[in-house]
Amino acid sequence: MSTYRIQGATGEWEVVIGLEVHAQVTSNAKLFSGASTEFGAEPNAQVSLVDAAMPGMLPVPNRECIRQAVRTGMAIEAQINTWSRFDRKNYFYADLPQGYQISQLYHPLVGEGQLLIEADEKAGISEDKVIGIERIHVEQDAGKLMHDQHPTMSYVDLNRCGVALMEIVSRPDMRSPAEAGAYVRKLRAILRYVGSCDGNMEEGSMRADVNVSVRRPGEEFGTRTETKNVNSVRFVMQVIEYEANRQVDLIESGGAVEQETRLFDPGTGTTRTMRSKEDAHDYRYFPDPDLLPLELEDSFLDECRASLPELPDAKRQRYENELGLTPYNARELTAEVETFARFETLLAATAKAIGEDEKKVATQVANWALSVAPGVIKSLGDEAHVENATAERQAAILKMQDAGEISGGQAKEIFEIVLKEGGDPATIADEKGLKQVSDTGAIEAAIDEILANNEDKVEQYKCGKDKLFGFFVGQTMKAMQGKANPAVVNQILKDKLG
């Protein structure tokens, strides 16, 4: 396992990291009301009487929110508690009309689970590692204070108030920023696969509270700080890096780390004190008297389990075992829902176009999907109209390349034209002269002329200077304006040079 350490003035320090990820549940309505959850509405346009805590309004649990949380728990191999209960978390803040948040402290919906992060040498993770997940509980989100609408007043937008959140609490099992980043990316992928959260950190539908402490290797856990509402993977890693170094500097200078809540400033890459960290007793939790306990029937659990898709780990293993892809390609292709969906669509189209089974074309399609196509799209910038790059058109390009009709470079040129203008790839190849020459007569004539003009190099090659073979290939390709089929060129040269 990779070993990440902070090098302090007095020796090495180990970082201990736990994450509490708040994921907005994919649902058309809020957790306890029928108000819409659509993002971007006018302030206070999506607030029911329940959300506004009007007297006499009683909460009614949204079955879909519970279903999505259960499916998420199943996706991380967690214990699903068939009996759970809602509690009131009491505190006063302007964006919380009830004066309490409905959450689950004592009896959460989902118990212990786990999540696997894969080895990634580039990221500094040398081995696969299992991260424990302590629990998932369901709770209400709060509203939002708006401080930039008036010079002397703050406004309250309650559109978000009452939206269902899953709080996914990890064990303090991570030991580096890289592991934490990998954990958040993997968790986001699972949520997107399942469809229980869109994982959009920019819009706030997924955010992390980052708990960091430091200790000497092998010692007890140190005092932790919690940095709230971090909304990108990169920022999560920056928070850990900064906090760990800040705590080490503080301890080594004779100070002590205080248990506190902090805020992250993306502009400076630093954290600052927000308030002292509260404990559970500070919130005076007690069971919500307006809500009955949740009791889940076996038929409901069976329905949830049956609705789960193939998950990232299973898909990655299938890509390696059944399609013969490398571990790297399998991991990259399964990292995001959109990536694997595009790959599988293109794989099916290419196998059909070429007339082979998917395994035989999988590596070619994977390399195209991960490297070639994104590179061309990026190079074109605004000129690329990705809607032109249908799976059928890309499959037609790959079919010509597989048949030796076009080279890799010509495939890129044809794809550029498709992105800019659309059109049939085979027609483009014919009209633009973007096809390889496989005519042995024409290639042989060019090679004969090159060998005749380089008799000294021919002799050197025959005397053991094998590297000159590349020279002859290059000269032939130059003479054929880069359009000669490399396989045909190689074979004719081997036959003639002996």
UniProtKB/Swiss-Prot annotation:
GO annotation (BP), single: glutaminyl-tRNAGln biosynthesis via transamidation
Q: Which GO terms describe its molecular function?
A: asparaginyl-tRNA synthase (glutamine-hydrolyzing) activity; ATP binding; glutaminyl-tRNA synthase (glutamine-hydrolyzing) activity
**InterPro entries registered for this protein in UniProt:** Asn/Gln-tRNA_amidoTrfase_suB/E, Asn/Gln-tRNA_Trfase_suB/E_cat, Asn/Gln_amidotransferase, Asn/Gln_tRNA_amidoTrase-B-like, GatB, GatB_C_1, GatB_Yqey_C_2, Gln-tRNA_amidoTrfase_suB_CS
Highest taxon of source: Bacteria
Gene3D superfamilies recorded = 1.10.10.410, GatB domain, N-terminal subdomain (1.10.150.380)
Key words, A-Z: ATP-binding, Ligase, Nucleotide-binding, Protein biosynthesis
EC assignment: the record states: 6.3.5.-
Q: How does it assemble?
A: Heterotrimer of A, B and C subunits.
Which family does this protein fall into?
Belongs to the GatB/GatE family. GatB subfamily.
Biological function: Allows the formation of correctly charged Asn-tRNA(Asn) or Gln-tRNA(Gln) through the transamidation of misacylated Asp-tRNA(Asn) or Glu-tRNA(Gln) in organisms which lack either or both of asparaginyl-tRNA or glutaminyl-tRNA synthetases. The reaction takes place in the presence of glutamine and ATP through an activated phospho-Asp-tRNA(Asn) or phospho-Glu-tRNA(Gln).
Give the protein's recorded name. Aspartyl/glutamyl-tRNA(Asn/Gln) amidotransferase subunit B
Organism for this UniProt entry: Erythrobacter litoralis (strain HTCC2594)
